[in-house]
Amino acid sequence: MKEQTEVGKLKEGRYVVVEDEPCRIVSIATSKPGKHGAAKSRIDCIGIFDGVKRSIVQPVSAKTYVPIVERKMAQVISIAGTTVQLMDVKDFDMFELNVTEEQVAGLEPGKEIPYISSLGKKKLE
């Protein structure tokens, strides 16, 4: 899910949707309005799920989308290689995530772990 907001209201550390990917804002630079133009903002951000650096330039008064990022808890059901099967603690939704070798080392069946969910994607914190 996502909601609309003005570019001028965004702040560092918050989230924005760029190229249909939820991103965390790293820096914002705003230029002064010119004789015939409006003020513009340059937003540098990093994707939450893919880690790719992205930047956009938009007028301060333009509307943009802000993702709703949810932090939830899940219980580890099983581990098969780098694929972990998890169950959400609140709504008992079952799903699988591919994780790194380092993340698998700290997991064991029955353990509760936090994860991030936004725009239909999920990732371990």
Swiss-Prot record:
It holds the Pfam family IF5A-like_N. One of its GO terms (cellular component) is cytoplasm. GO terms for molecular function: ribosome binding; RNA binding; translation elongation factor activity; translation initiation factor activity. PROSITE patterns: IF5A_HYPUSINE. It comes from the Archaea. Its main location: cytoplasm. Gene3D superfamilies: 2.30.30.30, Nucleic acid-binding proteins. InterPro entries: IF5A-like (IPR001884), IF5A-like_N (IPR048670), NA-bd_OB-fold (IPR012340), Rib_uL2_dom2 (IPR014722), Trans_elong_IF5A_hypusine_site (IPR019769), Transl_elong_IF5A_arc (IPR022847), Transl_elong_IF5A_C (IPR020189), Translation_prot_SH3-like_sf (IPR008991). It is found in: Cytoplasm. Keywords: Cytoplasm, Hypusine, Initiation factor, Protein biosynthesis. Belongs to the eIF-5A family. This is Translation initiation factor 5A. It comes from Methanoculleus marisnigri (strain ATCC 35101 / DSM 1498 / JR1).
